């Protein structure tokens, strides 16, 4: 463990109060003695995260900012430097998943909100934080994208577009800076509150839940991948399968998946098929 490059690092993570972000924060703190600074917009899930950290909660702090605003990243950078905090690793994890529906029916505000949080927050943070993190002995940038970036799914146009863009941006940034570690994660469906905007409570849907990975299992895979400095991380059987099928069957797979969604009669997919 002493030789692990993650040991005793200072990590800045967006969306670290709950879900995958909170899980990553907890594992980095408890296993690698990291100090984690979570950038969050509200306290949703925070109490449980602090409780799970227990005596290690002293290594977990929060900054309250809307990460989709460029000027807030300027403020975050200034706060860190004014307080002599050197961040080693930036993990872009914040994200929202709008309800399934046809693209032409997506409200302008909802479209902009999804793009701002799922894509622009990644772009802004990397641009602003690069000069600061570049001063670290072990600078690293990690983006939590999605399996949606591997294969398009009917009803997810804003989310898929934003996550695909964040994946592409991260990989381009990696090619521009081979001297630092840049990783991109494409996790499959995971049991978190990401799906809170859907028409039904996914946690109570046994059919959908059966295809979802447990959060802590997904977190362990992600952190292990970061530990090994993997550039592209695709985790979850559904993510690997989606990527494979779309790669070799780019026309028939999306149609087949749409057909499965339709015959499943799941409430969360209803708006995809309403003309």
Language-model features: where?
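Conserved glycine-rich cofactor-binding loop
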Residues: 17-19
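Conserved glycine-rich Rossmann-like NAD(P)H-binding loop of the short-chain dehydrogenase/reductase
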Residues: 33-48
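The beta1-alpha1 cofactor-binding region of Rossmann-like NAD(H)/NADP(H)-dependent oxidoreductases
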Residues: 64-75, 108
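Substrate-binding pocket helix/loop in short-chain dehydrogenase/reductase
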Residues: 101-103, 107-112
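Active-site helix of classical SDR
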Residues: 126, 162
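Residue(s) in the substrate-gating loop at a strand-loop-helix junction
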Residues: 146
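SDR active-site lid
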Residues: 174-237
């Amino acid at each position: 463990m002493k030789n692990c490059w993650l040991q005793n690092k200072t990590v800045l993570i967006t969306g670290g109060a709950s879900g995958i972000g909170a899980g990553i924060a907890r594992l980095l703190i408890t296993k690698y003695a990291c100090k984690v600074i979570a950038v969050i917009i509200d306290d949703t899930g925070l109490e449980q995260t602090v409780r799970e950290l227990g005596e290690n909660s002293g290594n977990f702090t929060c900054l309250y900012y809307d990460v989709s605003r460029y000027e807030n990243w300027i403020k975050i950078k200034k706060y860190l430097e004014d307080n002599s905090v050197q961040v080693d690793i930036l993990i872009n994890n914040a994200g929202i998943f709008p309800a399934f529906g046809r693209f032409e029916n997506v409200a302008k505000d909802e479209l902009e909100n999804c793009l701002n949080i799922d894509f622009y927050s990644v772009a802004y943070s990397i641009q602003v934080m690069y000069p600061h993190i570049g001063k670290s002995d072990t600078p690293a940038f990690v983006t939590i994208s999605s399996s949606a970036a591997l294969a398009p799914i009917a009803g997810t146009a804003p989310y898929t577009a934003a996550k695909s863009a964040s994946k592409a941006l991260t990989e381009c940034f990696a090619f521009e800076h081979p001297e630092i570690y840049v990783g991109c994660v494409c996790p499959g469906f995971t049991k978190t509150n990401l799906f809170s905007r859907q028409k039904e409570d996914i946690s109570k849907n046994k059919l959908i839940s059966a295809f979802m990975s447990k959060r802590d299992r997904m977190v362990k895979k992600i952190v292990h991948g970061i530990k090994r400095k993997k550039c592209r991380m695709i985790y979850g059987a559904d993510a690997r399968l989606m990527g494979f099928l779309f790669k070799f069957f780019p026309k028939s797979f999306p149609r087949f998946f749409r057909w499965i969604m339709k015959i499943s009669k799941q409430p969360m997919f209803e708006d995809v098929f309403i003309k």
